[in-house]
Amino acid sequence: FLPFLASLLTKVL
């Protein structure tokens, strides 16, 4: 799981 993906998820949520 990439940290960059986590940032996108947080942005969407």
UniProtKB/Swiss-Prot annotation:
Disulfide feature: none
Transmembrane helix keyword on record: no
Subcellular compartments: Secreted
Keyword Secreted part of the UniProt annotation: yes
Residues modified to Leucine amide: 13
Keyword field: Amidation, Amphibian defense peptide, Antibiotic, Antimicrobial, Secreted
Domain of life: Eukaryota
GO BP, one annotated term: defense response to bacterium
Reported tissue expression: Expressed by the skin glands.
GO cellular component, one term: extracellular region
The family this protein is said to belong to: Belongs to the frog skin active peptide (FSAP) family. Temporin subfamily.
Function field: Antibacterial activity against Gram-positive bacterium S.aureus.
Name assigned to this protein: Temporin-1Cc
